[in-house]
């Protein structure tokens, strides 16, 4: 990477979108790197940024579209691009677009499309 930024998660910034799309990291080695999630990102061609989120420490090889990781990714690209709203694409096998908006008091609004995977009722004795 050209640059690395460590917060709760690690962001590795690459020069080209294609580097992010084609990478095949060693999951065992990723467990030894700082950060809860290891993210790869680059400026995008058709979006503001592309990313991938690898989470072997959480027993997830790659998160298809990671909302929590994009809190830090959005803050980074907003600062770099001097834009309050960012359009991102997570380039996992499933992939997905995220629309990220920096709000007041360090909050970030994340929106995009989702897939319903379950519907359930939870009953609890109070």
Predicted regions and their residues:
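Active-site proximal loop and beta-alpha junction motif in alpha/beta enzyme cores
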Residues: 1-126
